[in-house]
Amino acid sequence: MSSTSTSSALIHHFRLTTRNLGSPTKQRCPYAVTFCNSWREAGLRYSVTQRRSKGFGPVSALNDDDSPTETTPGVGSAVEDRPPDSSEDRSSSVYEFLYPRKEELPDDKEMTIFDHLEELRERIFVSVLAVGAAILGCFAFSKDLIVFLEAPVKTQGVRFLQLAPGEFFFTTLKVSGYCGLLLGSPVILYEIIAFVLPGLTRAERRFLGPIVFGSSLLFYAGLAFSYWVLTPAALNFFVNYAEGVVESLWSIDQYFEFVLVLMFSTGLSFQVPVIQLLLGQVGVVSGDQMLSIWRYVVVGAVVAAAVVTPSTDPVTQMLLATPLLGLYLGGAWMVKLTGR
């Protein structure tokens, strides 16, 4: 190549017309050349000997025929390129969940990691504020709540005692905390949905509403079932078992520890159909597969009831295992009816 001594301040773009390839002939190679800071940044495909023999500074060469036609998404882009559909597994629901199509993605603006952290901080603050206000409101009516929660065994002649100074006060704080968390849970749920909603596809957004509504309904149904059925049955079993031998004088703190743990664990265990629907929509397991293992589910429901319930009596365990088994079978049929 012929060398031309020209000031770099006057030339911003020039084209190399010929390049000596080490043979008597010369080939014309249209390259767009721009000045760069280093050979590594330039990315020229010259050998070390060729680089040292050049008389000009570092340049970057780009073939006109190889020019990119579209911009590659940069770091922090919310859209991840789909891998090529080279196998049959790529058409599964799991693949569609991990790599959604671009037309399914929402048209929301992208945010930096710092913007996400700031939004998360604000939503956590709102959730904590709502739960704190609910706890204060429940503490103002804590005595009424305690009388309401004592109702399942009041007719059995059970007497509650304060066995240590301040035990009743700390019990009211515990009851207020549980009830405040229960009343503030809708706000927490809303903030979680508002935070993750921009990152969901349109299909996932349509699926989110029924899932949230069903989960909330099942949780409160579990609380009601525990208060009206499970707790009275368990406590009556203990009272009748001790009848004629010892008088039932219960610690107020231990009683509410038992009742509150039983109620909330029952509410959480009622989320089984929601988990099944999520697994079915993602494509991890089908409805037929869920129904085919019903024998193992029976054993698992009994074991789960024994772990979840704070008591060790068989009555409470069977009362909880029965609805768990029914919820599982109902969830499996729902997954099957949805075509999964």
From Swiss-Prot:
GO BP annotations, alphabetical order:
double fertilization forming a zygote and endosperm; thylakoid membrane organization
Looking up Pfam families in the UniProt record yields: TatC
- Tell me what topology the record assigns in the membrane: Multi-pass membrane protein
Swiss-Prot/TrEMBL keywords:
Chloroplast, Membrane, Plastid, Protein transport, Thylakoid, Transit peptide, Translocation, Transmembrane, Transmembrane helix, Transport
- Targeting presequence: 1-28, 29-60
- One CC-aspect GO term: receptor complex
Compartments, record wording: Plastid, Chloroplast thylakoid membrane
Q: Which domain of life is it from?
A: Eukaryota
Q: Which GO terms describe its molecular function?
A: proton motive force dependent protein transmembrane transporter activity
Q: Which residues lie on this side of the membrane: Stromal?
A: 61-127, 201-209, 279-289, 336-340
**After gene disruption, what is the outcome?**
Seedling lethality when homozygous. When grown on agar medium, mutant seedlings have an albino phenotype and contain plastid lacking internal membrane structures.
> Region (Disordered) spans which residues?
57-92
Q: Which residues form a coiled coil?
A: none
Where does the protein principally reside? plastid
The record's section on InterPro entries has: Sec-indep_translocase_CS, TatC
Which residues are listed as membrane-spanning?
128-148, 180-200, 210-230, 258-278, 290-310, 315-335
User: On the Lumenal side, which residues?
Assistant: 149-179, 231-257, 311-314
Compositional bias (Basic and acidic residues) spans? 79-91
* Function field: Part of the twin-arginine translocation (Tat) system that transports large folded proteins containing a characteristic twin-arginine motif in their signal peptide across the thylakoid membrane. Involved in delta pH-dependent protein transport required for chloroplast development, especially thylakoid membrane formation. TATC and TATB mediate precursor recognition, whereas TATA facilitates translocation.
Similarity comment: family membership: Belongs to the TatC family.
Summary of subunit composition and partner proteins:
In thylakoid membranes, TATC and TATB form a large receptor complex, containing about eight TATC-TATB pairs, which binds the precursor protein. Twin arginine signal peptide promotes pH-triggered docking of TATA oligomers to TATC-TATB receptor complex, inducing a conformational switch of TATA that results in activation of the translocase. TATA dissociates from TATC-TATB upon completion of translocation.
Question: Additional info?
Answer: According to PubMed:18930082, TATA is detectable only in minor amounts in Arabidopsis chloroplasts.
What name does this protein carry?
Sec-independent protein translocase protein TATC, chloroplastic
Organism field: Arabidopsis thaliana
Gene name of the encoded protein:
TATC
